[in-house]
């Protein structure tokens, strides 16, 4: 009989062990998974999703950058499930990379804008985790409809309460402002006050407060210095 190379054998045994662990975890939660077929309530669907996410996390190592984002999200929102926090963290990482922004900067904007609350509404009407004005949200949804398959006709102000949608729109918007003003400070001020207001002040040499930009940059430095936890 042909002797299998030792490294190949070890790899095969390792895969078999991982598969056995995966099957074992699924077996433990089989009753909950089967219950999905008898009820479609949001709570039970969320529980099933979190179970499957937990299994995936156990089997798949997470990059340090994602783990660091997750730790920031959970430190501000200990009330949400790990599965939900991972999903939010993944979107922050993906969108930041796509728009060439530091995810720690995106987290800093979220911290100052909403404190990571999904349904916050400002006195001016800005909504969601990145505090987007409804008219801006509608415009961004139309702009990105081809890229993400958004349906602008179904957009409502309440749509911005979806944190994943809000993050996608907010990161794209911040990216556009950095290109327009060619300055992170000015882009942050425009994110807060509106690009028209900042442009008008620049053209007419009108002073403006940089307090908002300072708050965001302070949060950014704090997040930047923090180390990702080890799980």
Predicted regions and their residues:
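N-terminal Sec-pathway targeting helices
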Residues: 4-25
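Iron-associated oxidoreductase/ferritin-like identity signal
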Residues: 14, 35-38, 231
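Bacterial Sec-dependent signal peptides at the C-terminal "C-region" and cleavage site
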Residues: 19-20, 24-44
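Short N-terminal segments immediately surrounding and downstream of signal-peptide cleavage
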Residues: 37-57
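Catalytic glycan-binding domains that act on GlcNAc-containing polysaccharides
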Residues: 52-231
């Amino acid at each position: 009989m042909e002797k299998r190379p030792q490294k190949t054998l070890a790899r095969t045994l390792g895969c078999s062990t991982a598969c056995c662990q995966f099957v074992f975890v699924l077996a433990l939660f089989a009753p909950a998974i089967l219950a999905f077929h008898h009820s479609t309530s949001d709570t039970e669907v969320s529980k099933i999703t979190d179970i499957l996410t937990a299994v995936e996390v156990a089997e798949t190592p997470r990059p340090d950058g994602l783990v660091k984002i997750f730790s920031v999200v959970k430190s501000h929102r200990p009330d949400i499930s790990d599965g939900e926090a991972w999903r939010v963290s993944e979107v922050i990482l993906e969108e930041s990379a796509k728009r060439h922004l530091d995810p720690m900067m995106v987290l800093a904007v979220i911290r100052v804008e909403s404190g990571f609350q999904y349904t916050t509404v400002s006195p001016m009407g800005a909504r969601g985790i990145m505090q987007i004005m409804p008219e801006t949200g509608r415009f961004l949804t139309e702009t990105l409809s081809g890229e993400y398959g958004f349906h602008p006709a179904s957009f409502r102000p309440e749509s911005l309460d979806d944190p994943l949608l809000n993050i996608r729109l907010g990161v794209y918007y911040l990216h556009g402002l950095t290109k327009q003003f060619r300055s992170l400070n000015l882009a942050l001020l425009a994110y807060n006050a509106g690009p028209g207001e900042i442009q008008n002040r620049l053209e007419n040499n009108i002073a403006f407060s940089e307090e908002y930009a300072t708050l965001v940059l302070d949060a950014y430095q704090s997040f930047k210095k923090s180390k990702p936890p080890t799980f």
